Amino acid sequence: FSFFFQYSVKANDLPSGDNVVSGSVIISTQDTSMIINQSTDKAIIEWQSFDIGQNNSVTFNQPSINAGALNRVISGDPTTLAGSLSANGNVFVINENGVYFTTTATISANSFAASTLALSNDDYLQNKLQFYSDQLSESLASVINKGFITTLDGGFTALLGGAVNNEGTINANLGKVGIGVGQEIILDLSGDKFLQVAIPIDEAITILDENEEEVDLLIKHSGTMQA
């Protein structure tokens, strides 16, 4: 089995095709910036696209650092983050077709997670961060970080998928960093086992990078992580 991650983003790209599934959210766009005002502790937004161009910014204004916004891309296209994403709370980006952070991407939040595994609405609303994929053996999707991800003191960063490559910088001062690959991944924010992974043992998997060259490891790390 193999995957080939293709990515492209235009300079003027901002997330589009929003549908607020849960919570109270007001979204406004002006020129190169998008403001997402969230007034409930939890919000779920489905998007046709969640791309951010290099000179563009997306800002989540949330009621507290414990508030969270789950952003799910449903179009079938991968997500490319090349600009700025900031939040005073927690942001989750779910795209089962891939998430790519370019070298110009900057992420700043209390906590941040990007995943190509699914997370159900019910689990999220019940504080169960249980990510899963029923198609891992058929189609692997990757998370590739070449940018800068920073979370507030005590926050967490999680990159989860069929394959994860971190070439960028992740700062989680006094917090946690989790890079996980598997068919099922659970984030336990209250216990000692922050990241729990179930990996299929009966799969022969070949990973291809963006140049269609074989990669030996499902997790590659050549960047910087501080927690």
PLM feature segments, named:
Residues 1-227:
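Extracellular and secretory-pathway beta-repeat/beta-biased strand scaffolds
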